[in-house]
Each structure stands twice: as C-alpha cells, then as structure tokens.
A protein has these predicted regions:
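Conserved short alpha-helical segments that host acidic/polar catalytic motifs at enzyme active sites
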Residues: 1-208, 214-275, 280, 369
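Flexible loop/turn segments at secondary-structure boundaries
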Residues: 12-14, 102, 167, 175-176, ...
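A conserved beta-strand->alpha-helix junction
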Residues: 121-129, 134, 299-312, 405-413, ...
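PRPP-dependent phosphoribosyltransferase catalytic core
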Residues: 164-165, 200-206, 359-471
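Phosphate/diphosphate-binding loops
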Residues: 195, 202, 207-211, 260, ...
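Secondary-structure transition/capping motifs at alpha-helix termini
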Residues: 268-274, 293-300, 334-338, 360-369
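Long, K/E/R/D-enriched contiguous segments that form extended
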Residues: 274-311
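Short, glycine/charge-rich flexible loops or terminal/linker lids adjacent to PRPP-binding catalytic cores
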Residues: 296-341, 380-392
C-alpha cells in the first residue's frame, strides 16, 4: 500500500510536508521520501528505508536542512519514491499510489520509444519510474497523466511536483482518495483527510474519479473534470484507513461502529452469551465498540497493543516476522481473560495465521470460549487493484485453501460465487470448516449486504471485488 502528501506555502512548506507525510505512516513501513522545490535553489530530495525506524526518526535531519515553497512526500511499502525526473517537460518529482498489473506490456511499449530504466534491487522496474516514462510520451503533463490513467490496468493516483505547481490526479475510478486542504498561505493534497488538520488546514474538497488539478500557493485549478463512475475500495473503511479519516464524506470510525452494530443484530437470535466483547487492536476496536453498544454486552480490552515500537504486522517481508510482531505487540490482561467467555472482533481473516495464534493465546491465558466475528465477509479473491498484501497466490487465503479441500480441486468462478453467498449451503460449510481449523468456539462473518449498509453510500460506487469477485 502507501500514501502521499503534498503542500505549497508562501514561506517554507517543509514543516507541513514532514508531518503530513508522517501522518501516513500506518500505510507502509518500507520506504519513505520527500522532494521539495525552492525558486532559488531548485529541487532537493531524500529517500530512506524505514523498516527499522519510523519516518520522523529517519527524516529529522532533512526536516531541518531541506527548504522549499512546494513539496511532495510519501510512505511506500514497495518502491523508493518520490523520484526526480528530467525530460522534455523539464525537471519534476513524482510519487504514486496504486498497482500496475500490465507493467510488462507497458514497459515494452515505452522502451520501443527509446526510454530506459534503472532496475530495482529485485530486478523489477520501479512502477513510479514507469509512470513517469508514460507521462513523458505525451507533449504536456495533462495529456501524459490522462494517457497513464488510460493504459494502466489496476489503479493509479499521483502527485507531480513542478516549478510551477503540484499536479494531483486521482485514480480514474477513484479506487484511492485524494483530498485537498487550504490555509491562508497555501494548499495541500493528501491521501488521508486527517493528515493536515493539526497543521492548520481546513477541508477544501475531495477530488473525483480521474480528476486532475494543479495547485500552487494561490489557487487550485481543475484541469480535467471528474468522471461519473467510481469504485472506491471498501477495505479502506474496514481496515486500512486511519480511524480519524473519512472517504467520500463517510467517517472511518463511524463506519466501523456501524459494522459492529450490524454484526450484533445478526447475533441476537443465536445462543451465544459472551461475558465481554473485545476488538483486536487497533482496527478491530471500533467494530467491537459498535457491537458492545448494540448488544449491551460489556466492552473490555483483554489484551493491550504495545504501540511505541511495534508496527503493523502485515508489513515485513517474511511471514515469520509478521507472526512474531503480531504476537509480541499484544500484551494480555489476565484478569479480563481467565475464566471468561470472549467475543472477539477482528477486521478480517486473511491467512488465518495471526488470529489462530491470538485465539490459542487467549485459551492459554484461561479463556473458556473465544467467539470470532470478522468485520468483513470472507476474502475469496486477491485484490487486483491495490498492493494490499505481499501474498503471491490466492491459495494463501484461508478461504481458498478450505474451498479446495471441500471441493477436492481448485474451484472455478461460478463455484466461488456460490461460496460468496452467505445464504448458501457451501458458504456455511466453508465457515464451519474454518471455525474448526482455527479452534474458534463460533464464527460469523459480516455479510456483504450489511457491510455495504455500514458504509452508507451508493453500492455501485464501492469496489467489493475481494469478497464477491465482481469488477
């Protein structure tokens, strides 16, 4: 995944840029960078590896030595960026968020026009560099950005820093957000809407799907109007988005309360009577509060996340490291576990590894029962549109492994759709088998129709591909 932030100022933008980028640290833990432009000294750029140290620690020096009236920066979980490019458009810096599924095909086309690339350490091309090369195929930034949006299969949002202003372009189907902020001496563009609030900016507006704007210290100009079709990622509300953020006017925190509330309504007729409701911190917390408020069952924190040093556990490259982080960052409160029946809400079940270990950890700490309520439907399809996971195969999903076991072979699309239907016999068999394998006392997933209701916008505007396979 990843996130970005850009700012302009009549004075120096680096303070705002530094903290605006830092507020995206929940979206990645591998690379981070900042690029600035000053009318007197030109461009400056810094990129650091943040796998073993947070953004603020790595960029403290740059926050004091870099200067500029405009700048962009990013947290990236894949490639090093922003990159600095010199072309017929002049010198510019670019940062992107998205996923390019047809990179090899595009690469051949671009190379045929005499472009060349530097390989990354793993032998692959930097996707942001590829986007820059696509843009350079056209006569100006507007045509270049539109060309990139047109030919990229997957998703693509970007910020481009030039001497005249910052271009902000949202993905053509709005799969990821870009929101603008305004204060007296400039503007900003941000992936997360909360990232600029403590910096003195006020909400200005969100970009629509495919919309392109350019802004400087004085104004924001629309260059390409937004399209009518949107497919924003629903998983942003479920997990990735920070609780204080909002997308399309819908609060992440409130949406998670709604999820918990609707989960509790589905449980009312079941013979499940836990002593307390808890959430797997941090993303499961709001879901659990919503459940507790609706059900009347007390909310508790049977384990506490040690936040000062442990990052999100999906980020490290190796599964063993992810599992270690998942274990080490949660500290038990035995008085709230021993002899208790617990209902635990997590944002999702992907591989099943971490939640199974959490469940065993609770049993080992004296829990009588552990009822699991994921806050989204079963994940049946790998995401085609965003770099949400390091998974290289859909068979890493626990659902797909269980379905193959039940079917005796790899299922076709129509069979998977049967398993996606929460009212089908196949769906219930899959859920029962997952419950058995994971040693849960009971398991009930959030239904897709309830999830869509939890968000509260037009269902046609939501991407739900990872749950139902519908593009």
């Amino acid at each position: 995944m990843g996130g970005f932030f850009g700012a302009t100022s009549r004075e120096d933008c680096v303070f705002d840029l530094f903290f605006g980028v830092d507020y995206h640290s929940h979206l990645g833990t591998r690379r981070a960078g900042m690029a600035v432009y000053d009318p007197e000294t030109g461009f400056d750029k810094a990129i650091h590896n943040i796998e073993n140290a947070p953004f603020r620690t790595k960029f403290t020096s740059e926050s004091q030595t870099m200067h500029g009236t405009m700048g962009i920066g990013c947290i990236s979980d894949y490639e090093a960026q922003p990159i600095l490019v010199r072309s017929q458009h002049g010198t510019f810096a670019i940062t992107t968020v998205g996923k390019i599924n047809n990179a090899d095909e595009i690469l051949k086309t671009v190379i045929s026009h005499n472009a060349h690339f530097f390989e990354m350490q793993n032998g692959e091309i930097n996707p942001t560099e590829l986007v820059a090369a696509i843009i350079n195929q056209k006569d100006n930034f507007i045509d270049g950005i539109r060309f990139a949006q047109e030919i990229v299969e997957g998703s693509l949002s970007m910020l481009i820093l030039t001497p005249k202003g910052i271009y902000a372009a949202r993905d053509k189907l709005g799969r990821t957000p870009i929101v603008l902020g305004k204060k007296s001496d400039g503007f900003c563009a941000s992936f997360e809407s909360f990232a600029y609030l403590n910096l003195g900016y006020q909400d200005y507006r969100e970009l629509g799907p495919g919309e392109i704007v350019v802004f400087d210290t004085e104004s924001v100009r629309m260059l390409v109007a937004p399209g009518k079709k949107m497919k924003i990622c629903t998983f942003l509300w479920v997990y990735y988005g920070y609780p204080s953020s909002s997308y399309e006017g819908i609060s992440v925190e409130q949406m998670r309360y709604n999820c918990g509330r609707l989960l509790a309504k589905r449980d009312k007729d079941d013979d499940v009577h836990p002593d307390t409701v808890a959430g797997v911190p941090d993303s499961g917390t709001a879901h659990a509060i919503g459940y507790a408020n609706e059900s009347g069952i007390p909310y508790s924190r049977p384990f506490i996340k040690y936040t000062p040093t442990w990052p999100r556990s999906f980020m490290p490259t190796h599964q063993s490291k992810r599992d270690l982080i998942a274990k080490m960052k949660l500290i038990p409160v035995h008085d709230l576990i021993d002899g208790k029946s617990l209902l635990l809400i997590d944002d999702s079940i992907v591989r099943g590894t971490q939640l199974r270990e959490t469940t065993e950890f609770l049993y080992a700490s004296g829990a009588k029962e552990v009822h699991i309520r994921p806050a989204c439907p079963p994940l049946l399809f790998g995401c085609k549109y965003l770099n949400f996971s390091r998974s290289t195969s859909e068979m890493e999903l626990i659902t797909r492994r269980v379905i193959r076991e039940l079917e005796g072979c790899d299922p076709d699309y129509d069979t998977l759709c049967e398993y996606a239907n929460p009212d089908s016999e196949k769906y219930q068999k899959m859920v029962d088998r997952i419950c058995e394998l994971q040693h849960f006392t009971s398991l009930r997933y959030h239904r897709l129709d309830d999830l869509i209701e939890s968000v509260g916008i037009d269902p046609e505007c939501l991407c739900t591909y990872c749950w139902d396979g519908k593009e």
